[in-house]
Amino acid sequence: MSNEGKPLQSTESTKIDAKSGEKEKALSLVVGQIERNFGKGSIMRLGDASKMRVETISTGALTLDLALGGGYPKGRVIEVYGPESSGKTTLTLHAIAEIQRNGGVAAFVDAEHALDPVYAASLGVDVENLLVSQPDTGEMALEIVDQLIRSAAVDLVVVDSVAALTPRSEIEGEMGDHSVGAQARLMSQAMRKITGNIGKSGCTVIFLNQLRLKIGITYGNPETTTGGNALKFYASVRLDIRRIQTLKRGTEEYGIRAKVKVAKNKVAPPFRIAEFDILFGKGISTLGCLLDLADETNVVTRKGAWYSYEGDNIGQGRDNTITWLEQNPESKEIIEKLVKEKLTEGSEVSANSMRPLASAARQASSRPKLSQVSANG
């Protein structure tokens, strides 16, 4: 019985091999035909792709980098939205500075006509080499964005903001004229046009957006972003940034505490939350982010108001400890290295975890409330 079955199995395997060989040959022919018609790289096996892992751009905040899985993904569309004065433009200026530090080229499409070059320079932006456009209409702005992307010479384009991309029909019309859905149609057409070019050029495009309230919403969240739904679908990452606290020394306000929720992420787990300080005139407090992570990973320990490192007290209160880190760059580098090692080993902190951690809760409870005036901030 077993001897009779062997030739049958051999015949079946031969037929399968022959059929798979024919399929492979047909596949090679059709792939070759597609590449001749549409160019090299128009179709490929995913395993043959030169870049399997998505490269990232640092946001300037270590906690937000963790929440995003490394930073802003390159070659993708990103939307940053939130209320006024919540830190949207500051986030993008830090991204521009990071791109320029690495030898890249960045462009800022200033549809709001509100870019402050002095503030941008204080955040590390090379304003002399930053490409800036202040378009008159939404069509002009998006056409400029498309041409910059097509050039493959620009690494990052920031559009500030979608709400300010006014359609030509609205500008040329009379005040009070209704052009229902004009901006949404404009954004929908633009996203269809530029998305394919973004993938080919590797350019990252960050759209800043404002919030509006839906009329007649009794239950649920009445907030929505401007420009229709196209950007929501095409964006690989959507960040919701909010101002949750005003930082004070005595009665003097010197910054804000911002909370960013990753509302959408196609390249890493979404719905993570990151918090960081934004200092007026200075931007994101990188040392503040480092101290928060050092506290959560127990590289720096805290008892009451005192922070200690290797058993030695280094500062009373958060502000004094940040000042100590500024004044001791060698110790700061060692602490940063230890924090990154712990995070690489898989340590969970509030920015890379979906569940609230005890250290994060302790940290939140120790911060002054909005109405509270603190001598240490």
From Swiss-Prot:
PROSITE patterns: RECA_1 (PS00321), RECA_2 (PS50162), RECA_3 (PS50163). ATP binds at G82, P83, E84, S85, S86, G87, K88, T89. Keywords: ATP-binding, Cytoplasm, DNA damage, DNA recombination, DNA repair, DNA-binding, Nucleotide-binding, SOS response. It is found in: Cytoplasm. SMART domains: AAA (SM00382). Can catalyze the hydrolysis of ATP in the presence of single-stranded DNA, the ATP-dependent uptake of single-stranded DNA by duplex DNA, and the ATP-dependent hybridization of homologous single-stranded DNAs. It interacts with LexA causing its activation and leading to its autocatalytic cleavage. This is Protein RecA. The gene is recA.
